[in-house]
């Protein structure tokens, strides 16, 4: 399949030891003769330059245009039939001006990143750090619940007369069933702990299955006659408002949502990746201007027992070098945003800061934006919450419903949206870092929630928020087979930013 001029430009520059700004690549690719334009830009580059800027390229192109204009007004010294023409054989089937599709809309794009905590980690592991993060979590989520119930602090409930109507906003400290089949839930606020009893024959008991430790909820009900326990009538989650109206783009533009590439694994689906990258160069994908990657760019090392036997590339830096080469197959004029995952070379505890400078430099050729896990990226006015998704393991394991499974990861994602937190339980399967503030709380409702990690495709809608778990690019490993994981390989959900419709493309 013929390569897009922007990709040929990037490869030509890389072969000569140069990087270039995205805008510079676009200018070079849009030249009448991209190959000759690269020659002139490299020849004019400063001796110590490693990256060509848009100013460098524009100066070269402007100078050439002025020179060509002068030659056109002078008598021709070379007969037309003797003029030298540079032709790239790979471009013979490329429609005229096809590369101008994305380049022509580059100025219309907008990318904003919120919640990036890279370089802002304050946790030291001291006791006060844990106090700070849980107090911040309580304050953030309680603020979303206080307008829905007439709550009282735990200290005030203890002094209220028995039989009174009451409500409390608290963090779930404990959940256990009684010998009679009822549920006893302990809620904690900044003043103390108060017990709640959920009777098994009440409708509200159906919500107990959705509860997770350390999430913040509100409960309304009636105090027992002795005032020592609250009988629950209703349970409230921070939730997404039912009337939530998501934002959309004001032009026809799309984003590809992928995750779990796992370069370095023997099971990396290299052929499928090439098919995906080739498709991005076709007219059918011309509207796909953004690529959002939700973690696990590489397979990593030492992630699980016996992983070394399943590695094709054993050095972690070599894995990222190879991933960067595969990323170059993607059109050079696409905007790329990525977050790390649990296989990437960052700390395991969440939130995960983005890659260090050494890894960033490896992936610099495509000028990808790299942010922390989780982060919210707003593209063309549409906010997308990117979270790798390790906590989905815990939600799926703890929830008794047959609807919350690995085969339907969007249902577990829906529960996280209800709780307005991407990883509520502390001390379980998901490692959480104590920080001065809770970076895992969902303060602002996103228009789209994109996760990965479980290697399964899932698409859904919750209160008008689109949910996408994007599958993976790794065939089943021996480890996955041992834990009965059958991955959805080479899937790329394509999000229409102007309608929020989602179309899944398969490249295996």
Swiss-Prot record:
Annotated catalysed reactions: DNA(n) + a 2'-deoxyribonucleoside 5'-triphosphate = DNA(n+1) + diphosphate; Exonucleolytic cleavage in the 3'- to 5'-direction to yield nucleoside 5'-phosphates
Entry annotated with the keyword Transferase: yes
Low complexity composition bias: residue spans: 66-80
E.C. designation(s): 2.7.7.7, 3.1.11.1
Organism: Halobacterium salinarum (strain ATCC 700922 / JCM 11081 / NRC-1)
Top-level taxonomic group: Archaea
Disulphide-bonded residues: none
Pfam family, one: DNA_pol_E_B
UniProt keyword terms in alphabetical order: DNA replication, DNA-binding, DNA-directed DNA polymerase, Exonuclease, Hydrolase, Multifunctional enzyme, Nuclease, Nucleotidyltransferase, Transferase
GO annotation, cellular component aspect: DNA polymerase complex
GO molecular function terms noted in the UniProt entry: DNA binding; DNA-directed DNA polymerase activity; single-stranded DNA 3'-5' DNA exonuclease activity
Protein name per Swiss-Prot or TrEMBL: DNA polymerase II small subunit
Gene Ontology BP terms: DNA catabolic process; DNA strand elongation involved in DNA replication
Compositional bias segments (type: Polar residues): 86-95
Region (Disordered): 66-122
């Amino acid at each position: 399949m013929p390569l897009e001029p922007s990709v040929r430009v990037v490869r030509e520059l890389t072969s000569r030891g140069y990087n270039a700004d995205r805008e510079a690549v676009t200018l070079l690719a849009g030249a009448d003769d991209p190959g000759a334009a690269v020659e002139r830009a490299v020849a004019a580059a400063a001796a110590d330059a490693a990256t060509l800027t848009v100013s460098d390229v524009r100066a070269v192109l402007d100078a050439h245009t002025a020179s060509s204009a002068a030659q056109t007004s002078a008598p021709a010294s070379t007969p037309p039939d003797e003029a030298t023409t540079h032709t790239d054989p790979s471009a013979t089937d490329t429609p005229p001006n096809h590369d101008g599709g994305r380049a022509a809309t580059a100025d219309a794009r907008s990318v904003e990143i919120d919640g990036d905590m890279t370089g802002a980690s304050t946790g030291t592991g001291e006791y006060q750090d844990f106090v700070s993060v849980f107090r911040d979590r309580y304050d953030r989520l309680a603020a979303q619940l206080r307008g829905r119930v007439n709550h009282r602090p735990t200290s005030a409930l203890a002094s209220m007369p028995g039989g009174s109507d009451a409500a409390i906003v608290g963090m779930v400290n404990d959940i256990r069933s009684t010998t009679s089949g009822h549920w006893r839930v302990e809620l904690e606020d900044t003043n103390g702990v108060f017990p709640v009893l959920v009777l098994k024959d009440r409708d509200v008991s159906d919500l107990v299955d959705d509860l997770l430790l350390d999430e913040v909820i509100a409960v309304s009900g009636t105090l027992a006659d002795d005032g020592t326990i609250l009988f629950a009538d209703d349970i409230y989650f921070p939730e997404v408002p039912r009337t939530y109206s998501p934002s959309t783009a004001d032009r026809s533009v799309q984003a590809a949502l992928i995750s779990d590439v796992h370069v370095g694994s023997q099971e990396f689906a290299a052929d499928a990746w090439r098919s995906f990258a080739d498709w991005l160069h076709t007219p059918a994908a011309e509207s796909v201007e953004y690529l959002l990657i939700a973690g696990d760019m590489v397979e990593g090392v030492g992630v699980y027992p016996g992983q070394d036997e399943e590695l094709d590339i054993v050095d972690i830096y070599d894995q990222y070098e190879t991933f960067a080469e595969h990323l170059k197959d993607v059109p050079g004029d696409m905007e790329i945003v990525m977050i790390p995952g649990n296989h990437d070379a960052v700390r395991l505890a969440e939130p995960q800061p983005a890659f260090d400078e050494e890894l960033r430099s490896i992936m610099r050729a495509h000028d990808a934006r790299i942010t922390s896990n989780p982060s919210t990226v707003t593209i063309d006015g549409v906010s997308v919450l990117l979270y790798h998704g390790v906590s989905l393991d815990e939600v799926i394991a703890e929830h008794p419903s047959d609807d919350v499974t690995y085969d339907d990861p969007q249902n577990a994602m829906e529960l996280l949206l209800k709780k307005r937190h991407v990883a509520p339980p502390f001390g379980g399967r998901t490692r959480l870092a104590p920080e001065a503030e809770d970076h895992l709380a969902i303060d602002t409702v996103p228009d789209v929630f994109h996760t990965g990690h479980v290697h399964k495709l899932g698409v859904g809608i919750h209160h008008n928020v689109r949910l996408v778990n994007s599958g993976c690019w790794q065939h089943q490993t021996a480890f996955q087979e041992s834990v009965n994981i059958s991955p959805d390989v080479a899937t790329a959900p394509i999000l229409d930013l102007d309608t929020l419709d989602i179309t899944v493309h398969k490249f295996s």
